[in-house]
């Protein structure tokens, strides 16, 4: 695949995504592009791709694609990074933003220090803990503080 585009790779709490300004660039073949840019061996490598798009409902629209090319509803870490991206790249001067996602309208409050975003607060609502709604391979209805052994260490996780 050969394309020319401008992108930014950002990381938030361990999630790294490729962010693309789809306001000023025409981006096509989104599932294929997401699979390509996410490949850690032959491309940029990431947990997925995020497009920053215009919105009729909010300040911006976030489209998030998983490494397999499927479009996801929402990711809080990606959402906060979108807030930083749009402010730091001068797409907005607002410090309170409404971002349209497949998961609904999300609200961000940005703290700016010396002209750059230094902190972001996101109100993404109550966590969804129903294992039938989120992809968790378990027979439990909720996966809360459950022991998971990784190598020789046990972690208690909530998913």
What residues fall within each predicted segment?
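Active-site proximal loop and beta-alpha junction motif in alpha/beta enzyme cores
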Residues: 1-74, 79-159
